[in-house]
Amino acid sequence: MSLMVVSMACVGFFLLEGPWPHVGGQDKPFLSAWPGTVVSEGQHVTLQCRSRLGFNEFSLSKEDGMPVPELYNRIFRNSFLMGPVTPAHAGTYRCCSSHPHSPTGWSAPSNPVVIMVTGVHRKPSLLAHPGPLVKSGETVILQCWSDVRFERFLLHREGITEDPLRLVGQLHDAGSQVNYSMGPMTPALAGTYRCFGSVTHLPYELSAPSDPLDIVVVGLYGKPSLSAQPGPTVQAGENVTLSCSSRSLFDIYHLSREAEAGELRLTAVLRVNGTFQANFPLGPVTHGGNYRCFGSFRALPHAWSDPSDPLPVSVTGNSRHLHVLIGTSVVIIPFAILLFFLLHRWCANKKNAVVMDQEPAGNRTVNREDSDEQDPQEVTYAQLNHCVFTQRKITRPSQRPKTPPTDTSV
């Protein structure tokens, strides 16, 4: 059966719905997308059509956008794996399940499911003001911005199947942005967020997702304690260990430094004194700062305790001088080794060249006895001429023979 026939059957249902009140309403199927309606270009998505009456045959139709050839002349059972998706797959889908009690043989159309394809434009940026750690009951502003002039933005939280939140972008010369105020903050609102951008004439073709932004609600549990070993004052270049502990049964501890976005995370360990503790090794330390730690549970990774009291870590010594010294050493030492190696090779090559340039033995007449007498008295001097080492044999004037050597050549 062609898609056109199935679509006409679905439309025909509405024309005949009056005489058939028992068909439709609660009998219409339910269409869902797994793992979600936001799909990266090149990935797959499963469309599943469920009927309350247990019928497992269904057809799919796409209401807008470009047609999808793989839907034509197809009757599906239970589910349909669609992909690798392209921008052509973006749009609104419905399904009709087989229905023997309907005059058309098909149920009413299902709920609409909008498939949005990401990766069509470059990604925007997502920020949180005043920051991603939000006290319970307070408000945070999520700002999505881009140098592309997007008329629409979508805000999506990972792990939920609901459609992304659609927001109207504010255009300006440098691009576009949108601000979304979220609160009062509760654990239900915390999570990992991403945003997307789109243009008006292609609303379901989205940009690549922004980098993930973790929104954390803090202040739900009692604060842990933070200490430094061997102490909060550290010599530049040395190591320090920050210990976060509590009698609460926290699974994970988080360590953060003021004015920094990132955080360190370690699993809590039960100590003999009955506390749950995590030790964060830091170093070599070059800069100080105020540190805090938080506790959380694995079941609620975005719900943290109150922060510990701030622990100021100070660094003594000239850290800048330490950096300069280390950097200079890294440059000078390899250069000195290379220079020594090249100079050694140069001298060896020069010495070989001097030996090769000596006169052949046949052109010189040397008395063996005279030569033997002169050898211990010969002195080798190294002369530096224009940074080049040459060797010369010089006979001391006081030791020169008074009579020329006898010519023994024939």
UniProtKB/Swiss-Prot annotation:
Repeat found in the keyword field: yes
What are the UniProt keywords, alphabetically?
Answer: Cell membrane, Disulfide bond, Glycoprotein, Immunoglobulin domain, Membrane, Receptor, Repeat, Signal, Transmembrane, Transmembrane helix
Q: What does this protein do?
A: Receptor on natural killer cells. May inhibit the activity of NK cells thus preventing cell lysis.
Annotated signal sequence range? 1-25
Protein encoded by which gene: KIR3DL3
GO biological process entries: immune response-regulating signaling pathway
Topology in the lipid bilayer: Single-pass type I membrane protein
Coiled coil ranges: none
Write down the InterPro entries for this protein, in alphabetical order.
Answer: Ig-like_dom_sf, Ig-like_fold, Ig-like_Receptors_ImmuneReg, Ig_sub, Ig_sub2, Immunoglobulin_dom
Q: What is this protein called?
A: Killer cell immunoglobulin-like receptor 3DL3
Query: What does UniProt give as GO cellular component?
Result: plasma membrane
For the Cytoplasmic compartment, the record's topological domain ranges are 344-410
* Domain Ig-like C2-type as annotated: residue spans: 42-97, 137-197, 237-295
Q: What is the effect of changing A348P?
A: In allele KIR3DL3*027, allele KIR3DL3*029 and allele KIR3DL3*031
Sequence similarity: Belongs to the immunoglobulin superfamily.
Please spell out the taxonomic lineage of the organism that makes this protein: Eukaryota, Metazoa, Chordata, Craniata, Vertebrata
